[in-house]
């Protein structure tokens, strides 16, 4: 990296934060935890190495420059996701998955972090993975199950969506300001997709499904429910409907 900041002088996020530190030093150091401490049994599951390590760049940025800097960096690297093939590769034939295992993997973790909406617990999960799977070879299923169990949230459909398909889930929603109600559902997703969404302004958790639901929200929550706020924290698309479905 010629002893310079960024990756060969470039900021992979386009946010400016990636030029504050040496990409190679930060990224490769992250592999001491995910790859060297926890290693996958099959390279088809290499997202466990690269997705978590790529997310360490977001955590590093957040630690030194603040939470919004970390959000900026993570949102910025999203532009590098191609979604041409799934992150998980073919098993038993020495076949890695898509190169999206880096940035899409990192955005998946950022998404799950905000769905949990408990940073203390989220960091406990990261440490717990490295403690409980210390110097072991693992499968993605073990990692997925660990996160679901430790977070007390079943993220299986979330992992299936992001690791095993190239679809970006879309949150369809209609805001009825007069009635202080929100109608919402998941679209462009696998059957049974049920990833929770936390309204970060108040901490209220929604549990969308593929069928429309309606909920009462206060003025602060309705005001927060905008494309820019939602997509910044979650790797999803949003579609605000112009009429009540």
Language-model regions: role of each:
Residues 1-32, 36-46, 56, 91-97:
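Juxtacatalytic substrate-recognition/specificity segment
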Residues 19, 44-108, 133:
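Acidic/His/Gly-enriched intrinsically disordered linker/tail segments
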Residues 21, 40, 44-48, 121-122, ...:
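Short, surface-exposed helix-loop/turn micro-motifs enriched in polar/charged residues
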Residues 30, 34, 38-42, 57-61, ...:
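Hydrophobic/aromatic-lined pockets within catalytic cores
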Residues 68, 98-182:
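Amphipathic alpha-helical substructures
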Residues 122, 155-156, 175-231:
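Beta-strand-rich binding/interaction modules
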Residues 232-245:
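Edge beta-strands of extracellular beta-sandwich domains
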């Amino acid at each position: 990296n010629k002893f310079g900041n960024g990756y060969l002088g470039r900021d992979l996020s386009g946010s400016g934060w990636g030029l504050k530190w040496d990409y190679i030093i930060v990224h490769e150091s992250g592999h001491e935890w995910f790859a060297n401490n926890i290693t996958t049994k099959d390279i088809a599951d290499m997202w466990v190495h690269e997705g978590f390590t790529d997310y360490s760049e977001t955590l590093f940025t957040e630690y030194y420059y603040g939470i919004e800097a970390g959000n900026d960096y993570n949102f910025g690297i999203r532009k590098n996701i191609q979604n041409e093939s799934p992150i998980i590769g073919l098993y038993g034939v020495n076949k890695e998955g898509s190169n999206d295992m880096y940035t899409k993997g990192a955005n998946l973790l950022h998404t799950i972090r905000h769905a949990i909406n408990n940073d203390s617990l989220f960091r406990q999960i990261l440490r717990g993975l490295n403690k409980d799977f210390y110097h072991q070879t693992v499968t993605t299923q073990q990692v997925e199950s660990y996160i679901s169990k430790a977070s007390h949230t079943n993220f299986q459909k979330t992992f299936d969506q992001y690791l095993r398909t190239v679809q970006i889930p879309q949150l369809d929603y209609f805001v009825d300001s007069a009635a202080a109600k929100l109608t919402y559902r998941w679209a462009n997703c696998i059957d049974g997709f049920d990833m929770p969404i936390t309204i970060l302004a108040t901490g209220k958790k929604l549990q969308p499904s593929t069928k429309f639901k309606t909920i009462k929200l206060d003025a602060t929550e309705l005001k927060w429910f905008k494309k820019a706020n939602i997509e910044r924290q979650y790797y999803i698309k949003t579609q605000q409907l112009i009429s009540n479905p």
